[in-house]
Amino acid sequence: MNYEQAMEYIHAVQWAGHKPGLSRTRTLLAALGDPHKQLRFVHVAGTNGKGSTAAMLASCLQAAGYRVGLFTSPFINRFNERIQVDGQQIPDEELVQLVERVQPAADAMADVPTEFEIITALGMLYFACKQCDIVVLEVGLGGTLDSTNVIENPECAVITALGMDHVRELGPTLADIAAAKAGIIKPGCPVVSYGGVPEADAVIRRVAAEQNAPLTEVDFHNLQIDGGDLDAVTFDFDGLDGVHLPLIGSYQPRNAAVAITTLRVLRAKGWKVPESAIRTGLETVQWPGRFELLRHAPAFLLDGSHNAHGMRATVQSLKDRFPGEKFVFLVSIMADKDVDEMLQLLAPLAKQFVTVAAHTPRAMPAETLAEHIRAYGCPAEAAGSIEAGVARAMELGGTGPVCALGTLYFSGDVRQAFAAQTKG
């Protein structure tokens, strides 16, 4: 088996007809020797910010001297990004070897595992092989029935900002969504919650009490944002002052506050994470595709906000970092998202829209999306490819800013097309 064949195997597994649940993941991991039972975890769920928070936690724990696994989704450029140890992606040859181990176990199951369940098993195997001290484990979808929830006693469960997303799978209210996320709370295990949404907070508090799980809600009154530019945002939080965070979204200090709170909870459990390691980890964290500046002048931004809750935060960041500016927006949005609410947020900042379709069946066709946008009185044109869309957006932008956003699924293609446009 080579790398391409390994990728084909992983992606060939179909979701259709599978009932949600943990039984397949448990069966698969048992056939592989239960590698997850050798590991310790920080488990991270939430609607928005969970990937950024997970990356910050991993960076800080690594700075403290631990060998740290990081499991995230989706990927931006290459699949291997999803499974990392100490900031290094799983090498191709090791990924192939693990797929060769997982495939016979998966194929022998009467109820064949889903793609994400296979990826979860690959991650657990790799982290166990690398003898990670701790793994920062990002939930794929929801919490209760997510395949990552096979873990039994995390060092800490973290619930980041909650909002309306994946309502078909999780339920139509914030209370339903909170209940799904709160499914990662285990008996006696500490919980850190972003909080701030009364309907959701009530659910998380109730579940934590039922599980006898000590709950810490992040105190954002202790967060002071001192300023931000196109290189870093500077903040103070609860005695840790003057942190220069290279993730420049205005919302990122709040994610950092969640990470800091979590690391202090871990410290209380005996993990040796000094304040100096927290500072170093935050100031060196890398997390591509989240309000990422690919070029300063004229500005070209790449952002993965893919629901109204995330878009609201991105729009505020655009206003903060580029006051008074109008943008050429290069957009692709999944057809199952609240497209109109997202467009209503973007329209006041728009000079022009260029629409494309990300390479996934869920993406709204470019012309359909352009028609939605024109209904708001904004000029929009559809491009036949992401490459053509990037070129056209840059042409229309001129000396002004361009922002590509709407889904993480086109981030890698946009990055490649931008590099091709600007090389030489």
Give the label of every model feature segment:
Residues L57-Q62, F127, L266, L346, ...:
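Hydrophobic alpha-helical packing residues
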Residues K37-Q38, I134-L137, L145-V158, L162-G163, ...:
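Nucleotide phosphate-binding/pyrophosphate-handling subdomain across enzymes
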Residues T407:
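Active-site-proximal loop/hinge segments that shape catalytic or ion-binding/gating pockets
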Residues F127-D133, K269, D320-E325, A393-P401:
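Glycine-rich phosphate-binding loop signature in dinucleotide/nucleotide-binding domains
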Residues Y194-T216, L230-T234, A299-L302, A308, ...:
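C-terminal helical cap/extension that packs against the catalytic core
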Residues H18, L22, R26-K37, A63-E152, ...:
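ATP-dependent carboxylate-amine ligase catalytic core
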Residues M1-N48, S52-R67, I76-R78, Q131, ...:
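N-terminal leader/targeting and accessory segments in enzymes
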Residues A110, I118, Q131-E138, P154-G239, ...:
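Acidic, Mg2+-coordinating active-site environments of NTP-dependent enzymes
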